[in-house]
Amino acid sequence: MQLKKPHFQPNKIANCIVIGGMIALGKTTIANTLANHIQAAKVVCELETNDQLVELLLAKMYERSDELLYSPLFQLYFTLNRFGKYQNNCNTINPTIFDRSIFEDWLFAKHNIIRPAVFSYYNQLWNRLAKELVNKHGVPNLYVILDGDWKLFEKRLFMRNRKVEIDNFTKNQLYFQNLHRVYTGFMEAVCNDFGINYCIIDAKLPIVTIIKMILEKLKLQKLDWKFI
């Protein structure tokens, strides 16, 4: 597996990497494990514990009770939240590992926001925020895109046993399938558009193998990071 470098190279590279990919493929576990191999690295998680607003919006979105209201609110909240997290943590003295990032939010919004006019507004907002991060703060040193087939996704989703996902799986099965079908290709396109070095890793590989592969790619970057 080769490190894939886009044709466009940005002016700024941030002091961070991102672990991204489809829902339930193990991003958080990999991010936390990887942090143990990079001196003083910190992980910025996708979901904060005890965030009642996130829990409410996530539940309402998956329940599909009022999609015209809650789906846009859900996407706007997550996008602005991740914008702030990236802005505040991407260039700290010590390396940061992000569990997903704003660069993935557009795809979720595309499949969640029903009204074209509302999505058009979101699309403009997302593009402005993403470009601001790229121009002012820099792109990640590496974007790890976890990939896996539908069976792996379904197995992992039920294994992690997040109640809101399990209870509403039938309502969201088509949504999950549509996301899964295009996720990796979309992320490749985003990385190429914004000039982000990336690699695609099979999520069904043992975590020891995945960590080894990521560390090998990071060492090729000649970063001023100390690996443990």
Curated annotation (Swiss-Prot):
Entry-linked InterPro entries: DCK/DGK, Deoxyribonucleoside_kinase, DNK_dom, P-loop_NTPase
Leader peptide range in chain numbering: none
GO terms for MF: ATP binding; deoxynucleoside kinase activity
Keywords tagged on the record: ATP-binding, Nucleotide-binding
UniProt-annotated binding residues for ATP: 21-28
UniProt GO cellular component terms: cytoplasm
Name this protein carries in UniProt: Uncharacterized protein MG268
Source organism of this protein record: Mycoplasma genitalium (strain ATCC 33530 / DSM 19775 / NCTC 10195 / G37) (Mycoplasmoides genitalium)
